[in-house]
Amino acid sequence: MADEIAKAQVARPGGDTIFGKIIRKEIPAKIIFEDDRCLAFHDISPQAPTHFLVIPKKHISQISVAEDDDESLLGHLMIVGKKCAADLGLNKGYRMVVNEGSDGGQSVYHVHLHVLGGRQMHWPPG
């Protein structure tokens, strides 16, 4: 977890991201789901027994800069996350998280929904 905090503290918006490369299939990922609007894949550094990301194919660097026109797309990410969670057997529950900015722990400046499950989640999360 400390590694993710360090990454978030130095990450900056702008330019291409690792997620853009995954969308373009320039680097491999364990893809769970894909449609014309988004992609879901397993996190390379899982923080729970099941941990995957759902990302829009449209580049949106942060939730704070999303446009009103992105509302349907952002909602779609949650619906896809719910369906993938069910497909992966997370029937006892799961957590959905979007990190925003460096203090929020955002380490990649391409909006992404974390879905974590497979164990009891704790509160508070931070």
From Swiss-Prot:
Effect of changing residue 114 to A: reported as: Nearly abolishes adenosine 5'-monophosphoramidase activity. A 3-fold increased affinity for 3-indolepropionic acyl-adenylate and a 2-fold increased affinity for tryptamine adenosine phosphoramidate monoester
Enzyme class at the top of the EC tree: hydrolase
Please name the Gene3D superfamilies in this protein's record: HIT-like (3.30.428.10)
Outcome recorded upon mutating residue 123 to A: Nearly abolishes adenosine 5'-monophosphoramidase activity
What are the record's GO terms for cellular component? cytoplasm; cytoskeleton; cytosol; extracellular exosome; histone deacetylase complex; nucleoplasm; nucleus; plasma membrane
- The positions annotated for binding AMP are 43-44, 99, 105-107, 112-114
**Effect of substituting residue 44 to W:** Approximately 30-fold increased affinity for tryptamine adenosine phosphoramidate
Identify the main location.
cytoplasm
Tissues showing expression: Widely expressed.
What EC number(s) has UniProt assigned to this enzyme? 3.9.1.-, 3.4.22.-
**Pfam families of this UniProt entry?**
HIT
Any one biological process term the GO annotation gives: positive regulation of calcium-mediated signaling
Query: Catalytic site residues?
Result: 112 (tele-amp-histidine intermediate)
Q: What effect on the protein does mutating residue 112 to N have, as reported in its record?
A: In NMAN; the enzyme has no residual activity although the mutant protein is expressed at normal levels; no effect on homodimerization; loss of SUMO-specific isopeptidase activity
Q: Which residues carry this modification: Phosphoserine?
A: 45, 72
The UniProt annotation puts motif Histidine triad motif at 110-114
Subunit note: Homodimer. Interacts with CDK7. Interacts with RUVBL1 and RUVBL2 and is associated with the LEF1/TCF1-CTNNB1 complex and with a KAT5 histone acetyltransferase complex. Identified in a complex with MITF and CTNNB1. Interacts with CDC34 and RBX1, and is part of a SCF (SKP2-CUL1-F-box protein) E3 ubiquitin-protein ligase complex. Interacts with SUMO1, SUMO2 and RGS17. Interacts with the Ten-1 ICD form of TENM1. Interacts with CALM1; interaction increases in the presence of calcium ions.
Q: Its family?
A: Belongs to the HINT family.
Q: What does this protein do?
A: Exhibits adenosine 5'-monophosphoramidase activity, hydrolyzing purine nucleotide phosphoramidates with a single phosphate group such as adenosine 5'monophosphoramidate (AMP-NH2) to yield AMP and NH2. Hydrolyzes adenosine 5'monophosphomorpholidate (AMP-morpholidate) and guanosine 5'monophosphomorpholidate (GMP-morpholidate). Hydrolyzes lysyl-AMP (AMP-N-epsilon-(N-alpha-acetyl lysine methyl ester)) generated by lysine tRNA ligase, as well as Met-AMP, His-AMP and Asp-AMP, lysyl-GMP (GMP-N-epsilon-(N-alpha-acetyl lysine methyl ester)) and AMP-N-alanine methyl ester.
Q: What is this protein called?
A: Adenosine 5'-monophosphoramidase HINT1
Protein encoded by which gene: HINT1
